[in-house]
Structure formats: structure tokens, C-alpha cells
Amino acid sequence: MMNILVTGGSGFIGSALIRYIINHTQDFVINIDKLTYAANQSALREVENNPRYVFEKVDICDLNVIENIFEKYQPDAVMHLAAESHVDRSISGAADFVQTNIVGTYTLLEVAKNYWHTLDEAKKTTFRFHHISTDEVYGDLSLSEPAFTEQSPYHPSSPYSASKAASNHLVQAWHRTYGLPVIITNSSNNYGAYQHAEKLIPLMISNAVMGKPLPIYGDGQQIRDWLFVEDHVQASYLVLTKGRVGENYNIGGNCEKTNLEVVKRICQLLEELAPSKPNHIKYYEDLMTFVKDRPGHDVRYSLDCSKIHAELGWQPQITFEQGLRQTVKWYLFNSSSS
């Protein structure tokens, strides 16, 4: 049994991770979260009274408070997810991204390093700092280029991805310089229950059922690799417990889709699952509206995940069709929880 400190555990991926740990292991979870607009405590309702779960409202940039958390709970591992993550918000206001994603990661690393030095040799050996990051640090690909591997250079395009690339570099530096036992994972686009409504899939679902336009950037031909959040958190825990210290692992769904394909499939599922439409709309696809493209919009993301497949035997279990159907159903019946 481990004491696992999860940062950003009230967010979309963090809450899914905590639910997975509580439901599938005997580990104790300390969730620290600042509770920004993207947090959703209802995503943790099923575990909030579990004796192996505790929540602390904390800003990861507050060094003294973070030190107290480490002292109080004596974590065996850190799973660092706390981050500002919406690309559009980073374009209109980058300061929060620099502060949380870079300064916050630095603060955690410093506290973790100092704490790690106080541990006995056995606990030092088993301690892990797992930094959960994004495929966007690699930049984008043309349609003909091979997928990104863990050796691909970083070439971020947005303030968001630049801040995550910087945080990855900090984590690697604390390993190289101080010996802190770290692991980094870079995942592709996640989707599933409890995702904030600003993201593509929940935005399209909520707009469609309200009869609002479905805004699609540019021509909608941007390609993303889609990963069901439950698959992601299972892989993340596997990397924490079985991955090699100092290594990076890509976690993807092996499922490349254009944004237009995704939106059209959502509309098709809604025709089946929510046939009663608002505002005398004939077809959900009639709501699709092409809008001015995002500045510096990446063309394609694709991850080569052969490393995690070969070393840890992990493969995604949920197909995009299964996951998207499950997600659409969830939003239709839980609109107040998203």
C-alpha cells in the first residue's frame, strides 16, 4: 500500500485517476487541488467518504503549504496533474499557464527533492515523482510524417504546450541534477465523463442538445489521437508502479480522427440517443458551423506507443466507438455534473 499525493485531483483526468486508485488498489490518496473553474468535485463523490481518500485545497505554487502537506502525509509517490490545460485560454492569457504549469511544477520538485533526501534508503529507492504531461509538447506533424516517439524533440506551438514542455524539462533536470526518481508520461487527447464543457467533445454534445451552433475551427481537418480517460489513468498507474525511473512513456489511443469526423460521429450518436431536437432542427449536423481557425493551430498529433506496449504490456481497452457512445450517453443523463 502506498500513500499517493495526486495534484490536480479534482480535474477531469485527476478525478478519474483517483477513482481508479481507490476502486482498484489499496493505496491511500491525498488530493491537492486549487479548485479553479475546471475542477469538479462531483466527479469524486463516490470516493469522498472513503477512509483512504483525503482532500486538501492547495495551490501548488505555495511552497510552505506544499512542504506541510509532504510532512503531514509522508507520500510514497507523487502523481502531478495540476495544470492549466485549455489551449484557447493560453492564447488569450498565458500568465496563469506560466505560473501553474512552470512555477508550480518547480515548487513541487523542490519540495519533493528535499523531502526525498530525508527518507531512509528503502523509501528513497521506491519513491516516485510521476509527471503527467501531453503530446502537444512535440508540436505537430504533417499527414505523411511518422508518429512521435519518446525521442522526438520538443517543438511546442501554443503558450499551453510551451509551458508543459518547460515543466517536462524541469522534471528531467531534477532527475539528472539531483537524482530525484522521476517518470514522465505524455498522453494524447483524453475524453470521457466529467470533462469540462470547454473541451471539444462535451462542448459539441451540450451545444447540440441546446440547438446551439457547433463551432469547428478552420476546415475541421486537424487530426488528433483520442484516448478514453479510463484507459489513460490505468496506464498512468501502471507506469508509476512498473515504469523505469528517468524514462518517458507515450500513452495514446491509436485512434487518429479529424475534428470534423469526431463532430459528425457525435451528431450521428445524438440522432440515435436524443432524437427529439430543439428549435425545430432537422438534423444535428445542420448545427455545424466552420469558424476562423485558432492561431498556430497544430495540424496533426500522433503518438508511437510501442515503448509502453513492449515494456509494460499496456494497450487501450476501449475503442473510440465504445468510448464515445458511453461519453455521449453520460452527458445526456448528467448534464448538471459536467
Curated annotation (Swiss-Prot):
Its lineage reads: Bacteria, Pseudomonadati, Pseudomonadota, Gammaproteobacteria, Pasteurellales
Q: How is the cofactor bound?
A: Binds 1 NAD(+) per subunit.
Q: Could you tell me what reaction this enzyme catalyses?
A: dTDP-alpha-D-glucose = dTDP-4-dehydro-6-deoxy-alpha-D-glucose + H2O
Q: What is this protein called?
A: dTDP-glucose 4,6-dehydratase
GO terms, biological process? dTDP-rhamnose biosynthetic process; lipopolysaccharide biosynthetic process; O antigen biosynthetic process; polysaccharide biosynthetic process
Family assignment?
Belongs to the NAD(P)-dependent epimerase/dehydratase family. dTDP-glucose dehydratase subfamily.
Which gene underlies this protein? rffG
Assembly, in brief, is: Homodimer.
Q: Which residues bind substrate?
A: 85, 134, 189, 199-200, 215-217, 224, 259, 293-297
Q: Which residues form the active site?
A: D135, E136, Y160
